[in-house]
Regions:
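Short acidic-hydrophobic catalytic motif
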Residues: 104
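A structural signal for well-ordered alpha-helical segments within the folded catalytic domains
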Residues: 16-19, 113-117, 211-219
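GT-A fold catalytic core of metal-dependent nucleotide-sugar glycosyltransferases
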Residues: 107, 113-163
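Short beta-strand-to-loop element that shapes/binds the nucleotide-sugar donor at the catalytic cleft/hinge
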Residues: 151-152, 156-181
Length: 230
């Protein structure tokens, strides 16, 4: 099986933990092949198994989204509203949790759009691979990963594989998205990332109850289960 690992990190986090994450994948994953998306100047890290991409060039539609909304406090998780600006969903009055009236990353749509830039670019670009595997940059692989395990979480007939924790207890209603596997050969995978991207470029994301990566991903996977039995 041929797989591509992808990740990104915010400025200042390379030496903090992202470098350690990348090196651990190179050391512990079999036949590791990584693309790292970064902002600004790339770090001084040379390995032929690592490809670098400027994240702002990865998806111009999502770059425009960030440029349009990065100065709107509500779109970056704040409470201060500006005339004609974004507003949180009115559904929070009845469906919101303890953070509904607080500043929180749960509504930082701009921040989490960076991850979507990476995934959409990778799924569209690396079509000669079997799977694209997203791994958060603050993780660490501490033991060797057998290829058999990777194959077990990347089956031929599954659209996406993720860490499911859906239940009725607080924030655990939506997935943990620190590791997500995208089946490049699945007939719906391009539609999936197109729909994900469109939530941002159409600004429909702001109609959702929350705007962070796990909630938006959860929203999309539920739609695909209902419409496509995926």
């Amino acid at each position: 099986m041929k797989y591509k690992v992808i990740t990104t990190f915010k400025p200042g986090d390379w030496d903090r933990y992202a470098k350690r994450m990348v090196q651990s994948v190179l050391d512990r994953w079999p036949k590791a092949d990584i693309t790292v998306y970064c902002e600004g100047q790339r770090p001084n890290f040379n390995d032929q198994r690592v490809t670098w991409w400027d994240i702002d060039k990865a998806n111009t539609g999502l770059l425009k989204f960030r440029e349009d909304y990065r100065n709107d406090p509500v779109a970056v998780g704040k409470l201060d509203e500006i005339p004609g600006g974004i507003r949180r969903s009115s559904r929070l009055e009845t469906e919101g949790g303890l953070d509904a009236k607080k500043e929180s990353y749960l509504w930082n749509a701009v921040k989490f759009s960076y991850k979507v830039s990476c995934v959409t670019h990778a799924v569209r670009t690396y079509t000669d691979y079997d799977y694209v595997i997203w791994i958060d940059d603050d993780t660490y692989t501490f033991r060797d990963i057998p290829m058999q395990f990777i194959e077990s979480i990347c089956p031929n007939d599954t659209l996406v594989t993720y860490l499911d924790r859906e239940n009725d207890r607080g924030s655990n209603k939506y997935p943990e998205c620190g590791l997500v596997c995208y089946n490049i050969k699945h007939k719906l995978v391009q539609n999936f990332i197109n729909d994900w991207e469109k939530l941002y470029t159409s600004a429909d994301i702001f109609e959702l109850l929350e705007w962070h990566d796990s909630y938006v991903f959860w929203h999309l996977t539920k739609e695909y289960r209902q419409k496509h039995s995926a």
